[in-house]
Structures are given as C-alpha cells and as structure tokens.
Swiss-Prot record:
Stated name of the protein: Cytochrome c nitrite reductase subunit NrfH
Residues annotated to bind heme 1: C43, C46, M49, D89
Pfam families reported for this sequence: Cytochrom_NNT (PF03264)
Family membership: Belongs to the NapC/NirT/NrfH family.
Protein keywords: Cell inner membrane, Cell membrane, Electron transport, Heme, Iron, Membrane, Metal-binding, Signal-anchor, Stress response, Transmembrane, Transmembrane helix, Transport
Taxon lineage: Bacteria, Pseudomonadati, Thermodesulfobacteriota, Desulfovibrionia, Desulfovibrionales
Amino acid sequence: MSEEKSRNGPARLKLVLGGATLGVVALATVAFGMKYTDQRPFCTSCHIMNPVGVTHKLSGHANISCNDCHAPHNLLAKLPFKAIAGARDVYMNTLGHPGDLILAGMETKEVVNANCKACHTMTNVEVASMEAKKYCTDCHRNVQHMRMKPISTREVADE
C-alpha cells in the first residue's frame, strides 16, 4: 500500500501544480480582459462611439477609464454588468439599429450617478441642488463628453 501511495504522489503533485497554474493563467486572463475592456480604445472600437471617444479624450476626465464612470466599481457587480452591457452593445452594433443618439438606461444612470458621488465626495456636501435633482447628470449632462451646444441654447449648465 505504501508503495502504491509513493507512486501516486508525483502524479497528484503534478495534478495540483497543473491546476494551480491553470487557475493563475485564467485569473490573469480575466484581469487583463477586464482592464483592456475598461479603456477608451476598446470602448470606441465601434464606429458609433468615435465622437464620444474624441470628446472624452479632450475632457477633464480624460485620465480615467470609461468604466470608472460607466460600470460599478465592485467586482461582483461589475462582471455581470459588463457582460450584459457588452452583449447588448454587440447585438445593437451588428444586428440592431443603435440610432444616432445613445442614451443611458436607468441602471446605467444609477451606476454613473453613484460613481460621480464616489469621486466627488466633497462636492456633494456643498451642493444644495443634490436634493432638488436626483442625478448629477440632471445638471451636468455632458460633463464627461464636453459641451455640445452654444451657450445661448443651453438649458443646463454644461450642455
């Protein structure tokens, strides 16, 4: 019996080491994929997103990734959120009709608002309008992607 155990020892060790190596490679691949798909070059790889990428690059938020605003920061919330949003984007850009104007859905608005508040904590303390308006983007509609309208035609501060 001990002779049989000693023969199985190296095989078991190889199996454990192989499994651990495979696990590390899988985690590294997921981490790289998550980081890569957070960045502007990936997000603007569909032609419909090119104008958004240009305005982001020129904005005050150019140094942060798209998903610093557009996805939850919590990894367990981020994974399904990105998977669903990615599948929807692939479908709309290949089989659907995305239209000229891209509007955020309610779930995305909630995520973006939470991320605004997370980064701009000191601003939230001083802003009285936080009680009057539900979302930061109710007043700061185009802060990330720059002003789109001449001053004379704006309805909110940063259109």
